Curated annotation (Swiss-Prot):
Keywords: ATP-binding, Ligase, Nucleotide-binding, Protein biosynthesis. This is Aspartyl/glutamyl-tRNA(Asn/Gln) amidotransferase subunit B. HAMAP family: GatB. GO terms for biological process: glutaminyl-tRNAGln biosynthesis via transamidation; translation. Its EC number is 6.3.5.-. The gene is gatB. Coiled coil: none annotated. Heterotrimer of A, B and C subunits. Belongs to the GatB/GatE family. GatB subfamily. It catalyses: L-glutamyl-tRNA(Gln) + L-glutamine + ATP + H2O = L-glutaminyl-tRNA(Gln) + L-glutamate + ADP + phosphate + H(+); L-aspartyl-tRNA(Asn) + L-glutamine + ATP + H2O = L-asparaginyl-tRNA(Asn) + L-glutamate + ADP + phosphate + 2 H(+). GO terms for molecular function: asparaginyl-tRNA synthase (glutamine-hydrolyzing) activity; ATP binding; glutaminyl-tRNA synthase (glutamine-hydrolyzing) activity. Allows the formation of correctly charged Asn-tRNA(Asn) or Gln-tRNA(Gln) through the transamidation of misacylated Asp-tRNA(Asn) or Glu-tRNA(Gln) in organisms which lack either or both of asparaginyl-tRNA or glutaminyl-tRNA synthetases. The reaction takes place in the presence of glutamine and ATP through an activated phospho-Asp-tRNA(Asn) or phospho-Glu-tRNA(Gln). NCBIfam families: gatB (TIGR00133), PRK05477.1-2 (NF004012), PRK05477.1-4 (NF004014), PRK05477.1-5 (NF004015).
C-alpha cells in the first residue's frame, strides 16, 4: 500500500540488493472477565488449572456458549482499525493435535471472519509515515500451556489459558524493514489499549506476534516465506526479522532455496531455528463448528458500539496539534501511551489558560517530567509530581511569576518534597524580579564593568547572550529574561 521501497531499506548482499517483505499476525488477548466460550476466569497468574471449566477441559457433552463481550471487543477493535465489520461470521474447527489442546481442535474463524480489511497509519522514527493494510481480524481460542520444568521425566499441562479469547489481527505484507514492523506493532498495541480491548502486556503473553518473512530482488515476485512463531517483545520482533532476512539471503546467494517452514526465535542466541514444516490451510481440515450457530448482528448494533469508542491516538494527536500548536513529534510522544495522553489532558484541565500555555505544558510533560521519570526508573502512574502540581508550575511561568530557570528548581523541590508550587514560591522568595529599576541597576553595573565585551557585542550582536547570562546569574535567575533582553538592547544600542 506504500511507495516503492527506499534504497536505505534494501539489504546489501554479495549479489546485490535484496528487499525484505514482512507480514505480521498479532495474537491479542481480549480484555474480558470470562473466556470465549465458557464462564471460567481469565485472570493472569492463578495456580495451574485453577481457571478451567468443563468446556475448557473438553469434557464429553460440554457445549461452547459465545461470550458476547468478546464479540463486542472484536467489533470495537475492528472499528479502531478502520476495518469492515462483517455482519455475519462463522466459527470453524481448526484440526490439529497438541497436548495443550484438549479438544483436538481449535475453534477459530477461517473463511468468514468477524472483521475484514482495514488500515493502520504508522509514524516512523525518521518522521515518515506508512499505511499498513489489515487483511482480517478473527476470534479464536487460545491453547493451554505445557510446563517442562516441573518434573525431570514428565511434562505437565496447565489449561488456565485454554479457551481464553484471542483476536488474531493479520496484516498484509506491506512492511519492508524491521523498524517498520516494530513501529506497526507499537501503534497497533497503542490502539488496542486506547480501545480497552487488549492490555497489550507482552510480558504476560497478552500480545504475541507470528512474523512472516521473505526476501526478493527488488521488483521480483514474492519469495518463499518463513513464519517465526510467538515472538513476545517488540525488540525481539526486530531482531528476529534482521536475522531471518540475512539467513534467507545467505541461502539464496549460495544457490539454495528457502523451505516454507515455521521457525522459533531464540533471544539468547539472537537467531531463528527450524521448528516444523509450515502447514497449509488444507492441513487443518477446517469446517464450520456444528456446535455454534453463525454469528449475526445488525448494522445498528455496530453503530451503537461505534458511538461509544474513545478518541483514538491519531484523532487525539490531530487535536493537540490543531488546538495547542504542538509539533507532530511532541504530539506523537504524548499520544503513544494512553496514560501519557491522559496525564497531559489532566494538566490542561488544571491550567488557568490552556490556550496560552498548552504548548508550554507539553514541553514540561515531555522534557522535564518524562525525563525525570526515565532517570528514576518510574512510570507516569507513580509520578511524585501530580498533574495539578505541574499545571501550577506552568501557570507560574505563563503569568510571569517565575522564570524557566526558577521553574526547574521549583520542579525539583516538588519532586523531592511535594507541596503546593504557589506556596513554595512565596515561602522561598522565588518570584521573578519584574521591577525594571532593579533590573536596570544590575544591567548598568555589568555593562560598566565589561567595556571590552560591550565593544564585541556592538560588533557582533550574538554576544548579547553573554550579557543576558551575567544578568541572570547576578539576579539568581530571578530577573525577567525578556526585560533583561530589552534593557540590554537599549543600553548597547542594538
Amino acid at each position: 500500500m506504500n511507495a516503492p521501497v527506499k534504497p536505505s531499506q534494501l539489504i546489501k548482499g554479495a549479489t546485490g540488493d535484496w528487499e525484505v517483505v514482512i507480514g505480521l499476525e498479532i495474537h491479542a488477548q481480549v480484555s474480558s472477565n470470562a473466556k470465549l466460550f465458557s464462564g471460567a476466569a481469565t485472570a493472569f497468574g492463578g495456580d495451574p488449572n485453577s481457571h478451567v471449566s468443563l468446556v475448557d477441559a473438553a469434557m464429553p457433552g460440554m457445549l461452547p456458549v459465545i461470550n458476547e463481550e468478546c464479540v463486542k471487543q472484536a467489533i470495537r477493535s475492528g472499528l479502531g482499525l478502520n476495518a469492515q465489520i462483517n455482519l455475519r461470521s462463522v466459527f470453524d474447527r481448526k484440526n490439529y493435535f497438541y497436548p495443550d489442546l484438549p479438544q483436538g481442535y481449535q475453534i477459530s474463524q477461517y473463511k468468514s471472519p468477524i472483521v475484514g480489511e482495514g488500515i493502520v497509519v504508522v509514524d516512523l522514527p525518521n518522521g515518515d509515515s506508512i499505511t499498513v493494510g489489515i487483511e482480517r481480524l478473527h476470534l479464536e481460542q487460545d491453547a493451554g500451556k505445557l510446563l517442562h520444568d516441573q518434573h525431570p521425566t514428565m511434562t505437565f499441562v496447565d489449561l488456565n489459558r485454554s479457551g481464553v479469547a484471542l483476536m488474531e489481527i493479520v496484516s498484509k505484507p506491506d512492511l519492508r524493514s524491521s523498524e517498520q514492523a516494530k513501529a506497526y506493532v507499537s501503534k497497533l498495541r497503542t490502539i488496542l489499549r486506547y480501545l480497552g480491548t487488549c492490555d497489550g502486556d507482552m510480558e504476560k503473553g497478552s500480545l504475541r506476534a507470528d512474523v512472516n518473512v521473505s526476501v526478493r530482488k527488488p521488483g521480483e515476485p514474492y519469495g518463499t516465506r518463513c513464519e517465526i512463531k510467538n515472538v513476545n517483545s517488540i525488540r525481539f520482533i526486530g531482531q528476529a526479522i534482521e536475522y531471518e532476512a540475512r539467513r534467507q539471503i545467505g541461502i539464496l546467494e549460495d544457490g539454495g532455496s528457502i523451505d516454507q517452514e515455521t521457525r522459533l526465535y531464540d533471544p539468547d542466541k539472537a537467531e531463528t531455528r527450524s521448528m516444523r514444516s509450515k502447514e497449509e490451510a488444507h492441513d487443518y481440515r477446517y469446517f464450520p463448528d456444528p456446535d455454534l450457530l453463525p454469528l449475526e448482528f445488525s448494522q445498528a448494533y455496530v453503530d451503537e458500539l461505534k458511538t461509544g469508542l474513545p478518541e483514538l491516538p491519531d484523532q487525539k494527536k490531530s487535536r493537540f496539534i490543531g488546538t495547542f500548536g504542538l509539533s507532530s513529534d511532541d504530539a506523537g510522544v504524548l499520544v503513544s501511551e494512553r496514560e501519557s495522553a491522559d496525564f497531559y489532558e489532566a494538566v490542561l484541565a488544571k491550567l488557568s489558560d490552556a490556550a496560552r500555555d498548552g504548548k508550554l505544558a507539553a514541553n514540561w510533560v515531555i522534557n522535564e517530567l518524562f525525563g525525570r521519570l526515565n532517570k528514576d526508573g518510574q512510570n507516569i502512574d507513580t509520578s511524585p509530581v501530580s498533574a495539578a502540581q505541574l499545571a501550577a508550575i506552568v501557570d507560574l511561568i505563563g503569568e510571569g511569576t517565575i522564570s524557566g530557570k526558577i521553574a526547574k528548581e521549583l520542579f525539583e523541590i516538588v519532586w523531592r518534597e511535594g507541596g503546593d508550587p504557589r506556596e513554595l514560591v512565596e515561602a522561598r522568595g522565588m518570584k521573578q524580579v519584574t521591577d525594571l529599576t532593579a533590573i536596570e541597576k544590575v544591567v548598568d553595573d555589568i555593562v560598566a564593568s565589561n567595556p571590552d565585551k560591550v565593544a564585541q557585542a556592538i560588533a557582533k550582536p550574538a554576544m548579547l547572550g553573554w550579557f543576558v547570562g551575567q544578568v541572570m546569574k547576578s539576579s539568581g535567575g530571578k530577573a525577567n529574561p525578556q526585560a533583561v533582553n530589552d534593557l540590554l538592547k537599549r543600553k548597547l544600542g542594538l
